[in-house]
Amino acid sequence: MESSTGPRMPLLKYCSVATSLKAPGWDGAAPPWDLSFTYPFALQAPWLTGHKPLARHASSCPCLHVADPAWQGPGWLGRAGDAANTWVLARREADGFYYRAQIKATPELERQGVLLVEFEAPLVAGPKLPAQQQRVVLEEDVIPLSPSVGYSLRPGDKVLALWEPGQQQYGPGTVLLGLEMRDPQRASKEKEITVHFWNGKAAKVPLGGVQSVSLTIWKKAVERLHKSFTREHPRPLHWAPCCSLLGPITGRITNELPPDAPFLCPLCHHHACCQLLCQGCLCGCPPCGTTWWPLTRTSEVMARELPELEPTAQLLPLEGPKEEKVAMHAPLAVSSSSSSSCEQDGVENDLEMGPPQRLMVNSAVNTDPIFLEMPLRQSGLCQPEWRYWKRNGPEPCLGKPGTRYSNICKEEKDHKQQRAQTAVVGTTKELVSKATHMKPPRTPPGEAEHRKRSQSLAICQWNKNSR
């Protein structure tokens, strides 16, 4: 019975229930052929002796290439003996790509749904496995080759095309620039078409290296190619396999992608296997990326950046004098920032007292600058000149955070102002006496103390009234 999609395509007829191939006499016994060269893990997995090695379980991840029920159904290879000497594209389990191969006559295997194929070129499965010319593959991993029909390919068609320089590997892709004309004579002039492959690369492929496939076959080819790559190139930070090659399957997910659903990444489709997490996507979403090829490891990037960071350590001693200068000016900056709350509290007090007498002396009397530096030393570094001229700023309300600190600052400020006022007054009298050549009058000790107390009481009384 031929398929409606064409003589070379299998029937698009699926069963929604997981089934298994019937193989009488296999339970608890070895299969009629040796699987050691086909599945290298068969000898290391003792659970295979008690189960059917070719059973299709839809609820397991295909680490041993366990197929999905969507690929089952009678196809053109279901008739024993009819597929002998047929050229096909057979999938290689080691890397997931398709290669040209020829089916060998093995009716006993074809009845069980498997085929013995001979590849056109010897394949090396890995450093520990020998080169293999013949191999047993599943029926669903074989796609029959058809004559070149390049003139019928249009943009958007799904194909398997040669993508690497050796012209041996067939990978899934989408036609970008096809031959939309239906005239074979005009199409024969064009010998190449542009194909956008699954890994983001675009290349021109000859018509003889393109095989048109259905959307279902294309999706399954991409999915299996993806899983084969993740097993060969795991990422150390994100790799968390859900099933093991050397032990029972434990972390599997029971739901697979439906046949009619678009091929999305696991971040976009929640029914995908956890092996596909953080490995790439075909949906084009930003967190998934556009390719599955491994990126540069972070350790290599850090190793290249380390030599660039070494010269900065040699420049550190040159910055020492600058740091000392900054440290000398630090008390001024800290005192100005810490006293900002105190300045707002004493705005009216500063306006009433007016500018300090030291500035008035500077404008009235031309004296030695040594005497002008004395009040600055007595007042301390925590009182910059500009703080006395600040005329605006809201007063903090009672109960706000920082009220206790502002009260302490106010008391310290009043005490410093009192000392500076006394020192400035004494300095002014000395300057006047020197200018008039008169001796300053001696003040009794009791009168000086009485004057200090009266001034402090007056300031405290004013602060209470201002509150």
Curated annotation (Swiss-Prot):
Chain segments carrying region Disordered: 416-467
Source organism superkingdom: Eukaryota
Coiled coil: none
Polar residues bias spans: 455-467
UniProt cross-references to Pfam families, sorted A to Z: DUF4537
InterPro entries linked to this entry: DUF4537 (IPR032770)
Protein name, per record: Uncharacterized protein C11orf16
Source species: Homo sapiens (Human)
